[in-house]
Regions:
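A short, N-terminal "cap"/entry segment at the start of jelly-roll beta-barrel domains
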Residues: 1-34, 69
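Conserved short histidine dyad/triad with adjacent acidic residue
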Residues: 22-23, 36-53
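A cytosolic small-molecule/anion-sensing beta-strand core signal
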Residues: 62-63, 78-79, 97
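Ligand-binding loop in jelly-roll beta-barrel domains
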Residues: 87-110
Length: 110
């Protein structure tokens, strides 16, 4: 089930999460044992350090620019671009400039 978002209404997702000075902010809009969908905003120079996920994690940039590192390879993404970070592989995110993204993580059936 979705939460924190109005159903049956057209949305601009980048407007559903706000920038906060010197912070990473998030808003979970769906979560269960199979999938997690979260909106994020990063102020410039904020980051999430390297970590691994149990599921494949797809990032789509909604605004701004991010550097995403996957297994020591760097990618710079801008608005409208998407990348999938494979499960079990270290990845990190850094705000080259302030940016917003939607993160969809799909977990394996166990």
């Amino acid at each position: 089930m979705f939460k924190n978002i109005t159903l049956s209404e057209i949305k601009q997702l980048e407007n559903e999460v706000s920038y906060q000075p010197n912070q990473v902010s998030s808003k979970t809009i769906a979560q269960n044992k199979y999938v997690s969908i979260t909106l994020f905003s990063f102020d410039k120079d904020e980051e999430i350090s390297a970590h691994k996920s149990k599921g494949d994690a797809m990032v789509t940039i909604l605004d701004g620019k991010s550097k995403i590192t996957i297994d020591d390879k760097e990618y710079v993404l801008s608005k409208g671009e998407t990348i999938v970070m494979p499960a079990g592989i270290p990845h990190a995110l850094f705000a080259v400039e302030k940016f917003k993204m939607i993160l969809t993580v799909v977990f394996p059936n166990e």
